[in-house]
């Protein structure tokens, strides 16, 4: 435990080179944990363990930030930036910090020769941020409606680097989306189809972890397209981004079902969708290894659009307060939500996402189907298995319906990817398989009924007896051709009976035995049973008629006696 706390402290220290905003501290400066929390700096609250690819919440650091007396009961606004690694997320957040510290100034963006400090960032091709970091100074802002809110800025580990699995990327993105009120999805140059598919996977992983699923579980998603190179098609900024996003997320009838599902999923996950097109910052930024964020090295187009973007997210009138399940979230509440969510991702309840949501969802649902079907089969074996006696068909059907409902409830209780519509197909598959299994249990149970087992020989014997009687009668009155035909049928029935007995005794020629059973079943259902039912119905009708006649006769006799008297 002491070692873990030490590791956490040094990770916070390493990620906090700029302890005071605007000042740079040397790496070898010794700063205790209390000083770190007093000075503005990035603090890692979700630690990424590369050895086992697990994540750990630094509860102490999070509580020190969010449970300060002056902010803990304020509603919170969480602005997070997520996306692929080495795409300038931390760089953007540092300009957000400049705005938060100087929002009342027209020149909040800073001076031309002022280095960019705050969240640690650098040029190059290797990742910088791991896990999830937040700025340890929570900004208290007065809203136009007179209320105060707390604003927290969040930086996330870049996705798809060489050291992170798909599960790592999904966990970080899902956690940041679940806990933020505005998620900035940082992309380079364009919105490609794989960007949308990854977004679908990551948001589904977040939706799955939430206990109650509402129609739109997340709040605002802002697509930020960096290095936009087509201003002649869609202009820089919010309006051009809106037009571009509408085209990208449009659901068309001639689209493949997979493409339609991705777009429907994104629309169903977020209450608000936006897009901002940002130009390239310039060659000096991209190619100069010593670039430190000075505005003089950044192109004017980029600076102009940056002045529009940051207030769009952080101006008091534009702030989006965090809500979960329709209720506002305070700083104190957010601590508890972080604790609850991280436990879910540390456990084994959730399926591990793969490269495509569809594959994971199919495997997940098929496993749920198999488990529910197995539960049904084992329970039915206890009712009418091989060592159980014959059970009345009505009782068997009642047990079947009860156990089927149990199996469906089990299927529904399993956490599944894909959404209700996708899972419904697998529930239908489960119900169909259960009905097929039930049909086999019916046959198995009927085989234990001595009368059912004797149905084939009884039917054949009845045919032989009927043919014998008819043959005798027709021969007596001179209809020899009919008598010969009846004798032929009687001989055929006797042959079937002997063959059936041999098959049952020896176990050979089972196909022939099955065919004889089917013939006997058809004769029973189509001829003998209806004939017997008609005879019984006629007998019952005759009995009722006789009873009515007898009753009427008694009444007439009774009235006649009364008149005589």
Swiss-Prot record:
Amino-acid positions noted as binding Mg(2+) in the UniProt annotation, renumbered to this chain: 90
Enzyme nomenclature, EC number: 3.6.5.-
Chain positions recorded as GDP binding sites: 86-91, 157, 226-227, 285, 288
Entry's localization field: Endoplasmic reticulum membrane
Residue span of region Linker: 448-456
Membrane-spanning residues: 459-479, 482-502
Residues exposed to the Cytoplasmic side: 1-458, 503-565
Catalytic activity as recorded in UniProt: GTP + H2O = GDP + phosphate + H(+)
UniProt keyword Magnesium present: yes
Enzymatic class: hydrolase
Lineage, uppermost ranks: Eukaryota, Metazoa, Chordata, Craniata, Vertebrata
Highest taxon in the source lineage: Eukaryota
GO molecular function list: GTP binding; GTPase-dependent fusogenic activity
The record's note on its domains: The GB1/RHD3-type G domain mediates GTP-binding and hydrolysis as well as homodimerization.
Similarity comment: family membership: Belongs to the TRAFAC class dynamin-like GTPase superfamily. GB1/RHD3 GTPase family. GB1 subfamily.
Pfam families (alphabetical): GBP, GBP_C
Protein name (Swiss-Prot/TrEMBL): Atlastin-2
Residues with the N6-methyllysine modification: 252
Gene source species: Macaca fascicularis (Crab-eating macaque)
Region (Autoinhibitory domain): 529-565
Bridged cysteine pairs (disulfide): none
